[in-house]
From Swiss-Prot:
The gene is srpC. One of its GO terms (cellular component) is plasma membrane. One of its GO terms (molecular function) is chromate transmembrane transporter activity. It is a multi-pass membrane protein. Induction: By sulfur deprivation. Keywords: Cell membrane, Chromate resistance, Membrane, Plasmid, Stress response, Transmembrane, Transmembrane helix, Transport. The chain crosses the membrane at residues 22-42, 90-110, 119-139, 146-166, 201-221, 231-251, 261-281, 282-302, 327-347, 370-390. GO terms for biological process: response to chromate. May function in the active transport of chromate into the cell under sulfur-deficient conditions. It holds the Pfam family Chromate_transp. Signal peptide: none annotated. It comes from Synechococcus elongatus (strain ATCC 33912 / PCC 7942 / FACHB-805) (Anacystis nidulans R2). This is Probable chromate transport protein.
Length: 393
């Protein structure tokens, strides 16, 4: 705790206003997904401005990787916390998320107003197919990065993928159970007692609290709040990890959107700056207008904020504990398997004729071979044009 307190009392080389303005700009112009966004933060804040030290940045990045939540948003929370505490974390996070939230709300309004028109349907006819290709290549890259050669991890991956395909939803208890299984195999319980380190799981005990939140309520906004609070606690490994979870709840359980509307929501997230999970604002708007968008976005980011700032003071001491990284590794592999399963589930809904199959295939190849030269937003725009062309024939 002393390390964290001393950190907060060091006079920073920047004001909270300057840091907030930086993240407001990044949230408005930061395209490229979570990896690109955290790269921009390192370039701008560590290398160029030197507001944050390399050690502080790496600590924040590590915490963002091991705790549930969207990577870029959590790193922004931590960097706001470093010198300005809880208030700094909240203001910086709000500044980072606000621009993309306003964009998706505007798109939600346009979608609601014009979604029934032929040209809008034609646009999303192509966009939905491209989304499948992009998610497929993302799942492939995540699989190569996270699973490795371990038979245990491959088993977990395949079980979660198959479960998602069969149930058409992500099973949270299976995700958490996967992390627990890897932990038990690598570190049997007698080893914990021997080492006396059961108290090392800083932050992880909070996760079941979010999982246990009931979703039964008579209020629509209450249902939205409870569901997206749960969603915010289970974004492990990548922002795309939330896709199968959201599909299971929004489409299968609550029936708020149909499959095509959900795919359109994912597409909107890919063409806007900021974190991918801001699609929750778009979904919330379609379900319950502007109040729904606000409730969904706030509920989504509250767990991410809490699971960043609460463990932060203790992270210097416990952050490198191998048990934490082992548990998170198992959960991440399970989430990656769920993403792979979601590709199949969503593909059934979107790739229903030759043109959509070709658009999806071209998007996949483009993301794979031309990822840096042809960013995802541009692929989506090209797919939209292709959709208009094919739709009219």
């Amino acid at each position: 705790m002393k390390d964290s307190d001393s950190l907060l009392h060091v006079h920073p080389a920047y004001s909270l206003k300057q840091l907030t303005q930086y993240f407001l700009k990044l949230g408005a112009l930061g395209f490229g997904g979570p990896i690109a966004l955290v790269g921009y933060m390192h370039r701008d804040l560590v290398e160029e401005r030197q507001w944050v030290s390399e050690a502080e940045y790496q600590e924040g990045l590590t915490l963002a990787q091991v705790a549930p939540g969207p990577l870029a948003a959590q790193l922004s929370f931590y960097l706001g916390y470093v010198h300005y505490g809880f208030l700094g974390s909240a203001l910086v996070g709000l500044a980072f998320v606000l621009p993309s939230f306003l964009i998706v709300v505007a798109l939600g309004w346009a979608y609601t107003l014009y979604g029934g028109l032929n040209w809008m349907q034609a646009v999303f006819y192509g966009v939905g197919a491209a989304v499948i290709g992009i998610i497929a290549i993302s799942a492939y890259k995540l699989t190569r990065k996270t699973v490795g050669t371990s038979w245990l991890l491959w088993s977990i991956y395949l079980v979660n993928a198959a479960t998602t395909i069969v149930t058409e939803s992500e099973r949270v208890e299976l995700i958490l159970g996967s992390g627990a299984l890897v932990l038990l195999v690598k570190f049997p319980p007698k080893h914990w007692i021997k080492q006396n380190r059961l108290n090392s799981f800083i932050g992880l005990p909070l996760i079941p609290l979010f999982a246990a939140v009931p979703t039964a309520t008579t209020s629509l906004l209450g249902q939205i709040a409870l569901f997206f609070t749960q969603a915010g606690a289970f974004v492990f490994g990548s922002g795309l990890a939330i896709v199968p979870f959201l599909y299971g709840g929004v489409v299968k359980d609550f029936g708020w959107l149909n499959s095509q509307q959900f795919l359109d929501a994912v597409a909107v997230a890919m063409i806007t700056p900021g974190p991918v999970v801001i699609t929750t604002g778009f979904i919330g708007f379609l379900v319950a207008g502007f109040p729904g968008a606000c409730v969904a976005a706030i509920a989504m980011f509250i767990p991410c904020y809490l699971l960043t700032v609460i463990p932060a003071p203790y992270f210097k001491k416990h952050g490198k504990n191998p048990k934490i990284s082992t548990f998170v590794n198992g959960v991440t592999v399970a989430a990656t398997g769920a993403i792979a399963g979601a590709v199949v589930v969503l593909g059934r809904q979107s790739l229903h004729d030759l043109p959509t199959f070709l658009i999806g295939l071209i998007a996949l190849i483009s993301s794979w071979k031309l990822g840096k030269k042809l960013p995802e937003p541009l692929i989506i725009v090209i797919a939209a044009i292709a959709g208009v062309i094919f739709w009219s024939k």
